[in-house]
């Protein structure tokens, strides 16, 4: 069995914000608005909320509990869980734990590139060069130039490794800053989009269910998959965070709060993107 963790997050809200920070990502900002727009609008939203509610009582608490009971990472948690069936099953569980771990590593590699591009865009926005540039030409120029974003990539990788090296308290402090900033930025954008002409059609699309769409099994499948991915269920992140959750905390309560703020992030992102698409007549 792997060495157990003996340090926890400093506060309840620190754990929740860190968990939300782990869950919120492309699945919320890009995936949810995209699937909402292409799968029936309000009908997809209702089904998605149903699955989020279910997973906040079943899947997410189970992963927090697995991590907390084992007090270690994904491999140790899977080994511990399978060993409860029989001693010989522990090794098999540890091997199975490599699947979500490998998946998380692949996602991290992709995110490192995406965050590098975002950092590049931030720097160019602050410098003013992006404000007047043709965005397609701007992206094409630096993405086709060898090593043009290497300095930004180094900053992203070093910053990530430093945060991880400093432990759970460092992740907690980072998310206490970054997650409120994330919500503030998207709320400001949502207000700005609400003032655009024609944006009201986007709100009607989002919140008026097409009841006939509920009969389409593919919409149910897409909504369930989106809820899985958005909450990071069946990954390794929530199991690892569970290892740093205090024994006094209620895992179901923590999972519900995590799911709530994760869903708010997804809906706010959709409130920015979908009405803007209707306003600018984008497909």
Kindly give the residue locations of the regions a language model identified:
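Membrane-embedded translocation segments of transport machinery
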Residues: 2-9, 172-283
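Hydrophobic alpha-helical membrane-insertion segments
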Residues: 51-60, 99-120, 181-190, 261-273
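Membrane-interface "cap" regions at the ends of multi-pass membrane proteins
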Residues: 1-31, 59-64, 68-95, 246-250
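Transmembrane helix-boundary motif of multi-pass solute transporters/channels
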Residues: 11-51, 201, 236-245, 253-256, ...
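Alpha-helical transmembrane segments and their helix-start/interface "positive-inside/aromatic belt" motifs
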Residues: 14, 41-49, 91-108, 172-182, ...
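Central hydrophobic cores of alpha-helical transmembrane segments in multi-pass inner-membrane proteins
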Residues: 27, 47, 52-64, 68, ...
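Inter-helical loop and helix-membrane interface segments of multi-pass membrane transporters/permeases
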Residues: 3-6, 35-39, 69-102, 112-168, ...
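Hydrophobic alpha-helical transmembrane segments of multi-pass membrane proteins
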Residues: 17-23, 49-54, 99-110, 154-159, ...
């Amino acid at each position: 069995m792997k060495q157990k963790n003996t340090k926890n997050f400093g506060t309840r809200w620190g754990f929740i914000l860190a968990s939300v920070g782990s869950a919120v990502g492309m699945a919320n900002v890009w995936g949810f608005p995209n699937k909402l727009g292409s799968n029936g609008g309000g009908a997809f939203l209702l089904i998605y909320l149903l699955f989020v509610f279910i997973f906040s009582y079943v899947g997410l608490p189970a992963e927090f509990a697995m991590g907390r009971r084992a007090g270690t990472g994904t491999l140790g948690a899977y080994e511990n869980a399978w060993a409860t069936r029989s001693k010989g099953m522990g090794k098999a569980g540890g091997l199975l734990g490599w699947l979500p771990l490998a998946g998380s590593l692949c996602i991290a590699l992709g995110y490192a590139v995406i965050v590098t591009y975002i950092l590049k865009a931030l720097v160019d926005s602050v410098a003013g060069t992006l404000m007047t540039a043709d965005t397609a030409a701007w992206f094409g120029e630096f993405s086709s130039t060898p090593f043009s974003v290497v300095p930004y990539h180094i900053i992203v990788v070093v910053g990530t490794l430093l945060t991880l090296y400093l432990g759970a308290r460092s992740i907690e402090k980072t998310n206490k800053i970054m997650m409120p900033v994330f919500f503030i930025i998207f709320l400001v954008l949502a207000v700005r989009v609400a003032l655009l002409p024609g944006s009201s059609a986007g709100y009607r699309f989002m919140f008026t269910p097409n009841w006939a769409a509920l009969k389409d099994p593919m919409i149910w499948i897409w909504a369930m998959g989106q809820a899985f991915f958005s909450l990071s269920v069946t990954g390794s992140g929530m199991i690892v965070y569970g290892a740093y959750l205090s024994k006094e905390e209620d895992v179901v309560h923590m999972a519900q709060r995590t799911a709530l703020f994760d869903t708010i992030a997804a809906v706010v992102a959709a409130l920015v993107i979908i009405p803007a698409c209707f306003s600018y007549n984008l497909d």
